[in-house]
């Protein structure tokens, strides 16, 4: 079974340089255009002869608006419903949420220093740790991999997807070698509307952070 892991399109907070976490932020105009490009990508994917006998049978999304809006474009192109999975939510960034990244050091100097230390078990006040995020993301992808379908598209967030990938593959795969010494902190950032493929059982990383489908 193939999982196509998609980071949502650009959100308003991405554009503003603001910490989102689990705040329910909509897509920017550019993000909506990216989501439409993802709809075109999903049509090409389902029509490709090389995809046989793969069938995209399910589209899953985080409950957060920026992911649901992206998933809705994809699902509509495939004639499928969007199914929501709470475990795909982004990191709960606690007291950081809603603040501009540029203002964090001034507003929360001690907390930012601890977060940037790379301590996997440091819990942002009011939020969660990288270790908690990785465990949640990994368990969710493993659960979805057990579904009775040959292929699915999973729309989520950069933090939860990279944390889950680092947990599963960071010490084994060359594309994720940057995570070998400090998992969950040194993974390359996933681009908005990038596609990463996982093959199950395994998982085996087929591709990582692909953006060639975006204009």
Predicted regions and their residues:
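Active-site signature of alpha/beta-hydrolase-fold catalytic machinery across serine-
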Residues: 73, 163-167
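Short active-site segment of divalent metal-dependent hydrolases/proteases
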Residues: 11, 160-161
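Active-site-proximal alpha-helix that buttresses catalytic centers in soluble enzyme cores
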Residues: 7-80, 84
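Generic beta-sheet signal
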Residues: 3, 150-156
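Phosphate-handling substructures
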Residues: 76-138, 207-209
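Short beta-strand scaffold positions
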Residues: 61-62, 135, 155-156
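Active-site catalytic microenvironments for nucleophilic, acid-base chemistry
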Residues: 41, 45, 77, 143, ...
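Acidic, low-complexity terminal tails and accessory targeting/binding regions
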Residues: 91-103, 166-215
């Amino acid at each position: 079974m193939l999982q196509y892991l998609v980071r949502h399109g650009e959100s308003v907070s991405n554009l503003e340089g603001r910490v989102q976490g689990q705040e329910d932020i909509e897509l920017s105009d550019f993000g909506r255009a990216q989501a439409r490009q993802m709809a075109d990508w999903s049509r090409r994917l389902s029509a490709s002869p090389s995809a046989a006998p793969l069938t995209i049978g399910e589209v899953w999304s985080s409950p957060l608006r920026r992911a649901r809006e992206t998933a809705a474009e994809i699902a509509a192109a495939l004639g499928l419903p969007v199914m929501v999975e709470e475990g795909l939510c982004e990191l709960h960034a606690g007291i950081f949420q809603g603040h501009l990244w540029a203002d964090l050091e001034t507003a929360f100097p001690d907390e930012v220093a601890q977060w940037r230390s790379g301590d996997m078990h440091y819990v942002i006040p009011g939020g969660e740790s990288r270790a908690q995020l990785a465990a949640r993301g990994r368990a969710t992808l493993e659960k979805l991999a057990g579904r009775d379908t040959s292929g699915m598209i999973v729309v989520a967030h950069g933090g939860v997807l990279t944390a889950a990938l680092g947990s599963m593959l960071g010490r084994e795969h060359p594309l994720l070698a940057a995570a070998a010494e400090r998992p969950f902190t040194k993974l390359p950032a996933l681009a908005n509307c990038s596609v990463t493929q996982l093959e199950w059982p395994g998982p085996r990383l087929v591709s990582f952070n692909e953006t060639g489908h975006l204009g």
